């Protein structure tokens, strides 16, 4: 039975006639786009918004720019003491199927729940007295309860922690006959590790014998036996997070999933990188937590937050993980092992036990099919079909997950060991003999909001709390933030991180630090007096190693505080004094009383009672989030609110007026003035003038570049890509306070980086002296700077390769550039060699540096516009992508263009040759002028302009539109109108060239050549699979495609039925069936008059052409699709819902003065469609039919057309991911609706303009 959501779907997802198709109505979550605009559980939303566009540029290389590799440490290598075992616990957990409101893709709910992170701990420790005395002479005692809310950072690199051991109850693969008791809530056991790119997985110590029992498989599985026999190991878990993915809490809060869902990608030809890249480009529709194949586990979203992978009901509950298809026995076995290991790790980490939900809808391990069956909100049935194709089953996979979990929990013997005894559960803990490995005991982890200083004598930093020894550290006697507390057995650890950046250092033992509780910082706006010489610190409770500066001047100075934090019982304030900023204990500050202002009459001119002084200044400042606004003049009484906060600006002037001090801030990179700000509203630093430098450094991947020195997160210009240290070429340097910032370029990205993140590369070895030659003399005299040039080059077949920088010692393979022509924009001498920078054929994108010895180079002249027709010679070199192009860059061969007419639009000189750019055979490119012959002059002929009504599509963005035909001066580029409709009203032929006069999409009238127009625009996209392959996938689905061989009787379609229905070549040749490829997200600018003629006699929709036209343009929807939707929903405009009514006292009133209309059936639920539909229309304010058309179109567009599947064919067959997210089961669904749309086009007197046709291999 179809499930309703927000809107009563027509039974064809807009078009299908009653009884003509079976439609899947519940397309949510992984199937539809979630409204993110009002969700209050989004974390770091400002930063996400600011970095989205920059992050998207990295999508095509999904796992290259990983700053670190996540390592799951297997705690199974640490054998637990028998005393730590508990009795068997039969704990049943019942999944709550109640729909929970929250912005988790549930389309019926608009309420957002503000879930907050929950700090959890299972151990209670007694208060500890701290007898350490600071240099300030007061004692810091840790005896105060801190009840402030802690913001927990859940994205620590994960390591399989070791929670309390509990027996796992294996559920048989059969429905339960007895009621299931409610499941006990278990405390999540956080993953205990730090960010560490160098962390390595532990190697299990050789343990030929163990006292643990061997696991007894619950199902027979040759693949699982193969995995066990070969003792397959799971790979390191890689993190490839994307900053612009939304972060929403689960329904129980951040870091509290209730289980894991098994998916498969349903794409037999894709790879793990391809799946991730596709997901990142289409994350608005769906994204998951991780992908697994036979070689890799890549986590793509933090598991502490929900993903959009399993529908509106399942998304706020479960972790979603996709299995990428593999094609041989060994690879499939490895992928199952990898999935089971990842799933067991997640269950262990979050304190969940394996519990299959497949047969009763209750548990922690689900398939997508089980979610569809028991919870709803989705209709997928994976991964059963894929598993069956490898003679495997979900039951076998679950058995492997269960075994992995028990191994990790130390309940059964690891693979590769021999079990000697089968221990019984003691009624009382006994004292075992000394184990061969250390006992771990119970692990508890809790969030912490404190600070700590590492003592000079310590045990080192630990990557995980399971490590036997720590690594030596120099980070002693400094104050760090503490974000986590962990207790393992009798040991207690703190996770310490840099106070200001959040960079994690590692775990330290409790006895190795001086610890203090800390409350969260709060913003303040208070002035104090401070004595000269008082130290400022970079952190509160800072040490001598963290001094930011000293207060200068004579006599008491003014310290303007902007932030305050309580450390134990002491108060520290952050602020500025004389251009320096830092933290000071409140004990060193004296509160200054605010002067009482004396009322004065309002002057007609700015007051001059107070002395004004203005001086030039060279500094930088960041405006605090809390401020008094921007002042146009320092005489203004109040400032204007500003959003330019927490950004770095240049300061050019300083002004004092009475007791107030102001800074004049401007954009750092342009002359744009922002305004005056009060001194107390900024964090200010002195700055020296920038100086030019020419220096090379190395920088680590992931390092941020900023658009300004001392930039903030709002001014990120990018991040360093690549693996291993990269070369940063600095060209400018500026000192901000005592820090040095350098501006330069790395891997094509430019920006500012603190010198602290740069390293000077080791000096290269001196080369053996060579005798002087003419080449060397040239190299010595050539300036060592980059020159801008205009040249063109062909890469030789045998070349030394391409470099990202001339400083790279080793070039990358340049074979793919060989025997091709590229533009040259830069030239630089380096040592004895000369290099040039090659750009792609569009001039825009630099490819890399080549040695000139590897190129044939010619000078390139300026492009000149021309308008001339030529005849192509019988013997010619063809049409090329680039002037002086090679055989590898030919668009049309010489035979294809010989004796043809070439319409040139511009020309350029290459050395002594001239190349012309133009059009021939509907293709554009370059031809050598030697291959062309200019036609003999003929007498101009001009026909009279005649009326001609037709809507074309502009197909040549490189063409022009004209004020008058054949005008050489009054012409303008068509680039902005490419692929847009052009409504023609007149036709004229001049000198054999047909011209059309009509209206552009912006309403402007113009002349365009017929060669730049097309009656329809057809695009083809390659699928990558054969028709047989995709048809086999569709025919093999658990829910088979349907066909009516006898009217009214549905049966399963066979392979031939499906293949016939999916054959795009056949469909594209049929004038009606072709319309299933019509793009429904592209309006055609059909005239309002034509629409009104078609709507004549269509009830309240009559004469609503203007409304449909407006709706189509506003929301990007094909007009005919929108009209057909409305006609079917309203019974050709005659339904009461369309004619309008009101709802008064929850009753429908049809004779009210004000009526509300609903022409698309939105929210017209089946139980009472008229009342519900009118209520929705009233809430939306649709008190006219035109408002209902325009307002309803927005919903139609967002719910269907804009969801990614923008043609009827894509809606039915989803060729990009066959067998998934399909809107119907009837094999004839797209055909039926294509005929309906074609019929409407015929009645309107138009044809479809935009088609998107898939092509199979």
Curated annotation (Swiss-Prot):
Question: Hydrolase: is it a keyword of this entry?
Answer: yes
The UniProt annotation puts the region (N-acetylmuramoyl-L-alanine amidase) at: 197-776
Q: Which residues form the signal peptide?
A: 1-29
Which stretches of sequence are listed as region Endo-beta-N-acetylglucosaminidase? 777-1257
EC numbers for this chain: 3.5.1.28, 3.2.1.96
* Span of domain GW: 444-518, 520-594, 613-687, 689-763, 785-860, 862-937, 944-1018
Which modifications occur after translation, per UniProt?
A: Undergoes proteolytic processing to generate the two extracellular lytic enzymes, probably at the septal region on the cell surface.
Q: Where is the composition biased (Polar residues)?
A: 99-137
| Low complexity: bias regions | 173-208, 419-440
Task: Give the protein family.
Answer: In the N-terminal section; belongs to the N-acetylmuramoyl-L-alanine amidase 2 family. In the C-terminal section; belongs to the glycosyl hydrolase 73 family.
**Function summary:** Endohydrolysis of the di-N-acetylchitobiosyl unit in high-mannose glycopeptides and glycoproteins containing the -[(Man)5(GlcNAc)2]-Asn structure. One N-acetyl-D-glucosamine residue remains attached to the protein; the rest of the oligosaccharide is released intact. Cleaves the peptidoglycan connecting the daughter cells at the end of the cell division cycle, resulting in the separation of the two newly divided cells. Acts as an autolysin in penicillin-induced lysis.
Record's protein name:
Bifunctional autolysin
What would be the name of the gene that encodes this protein? atl
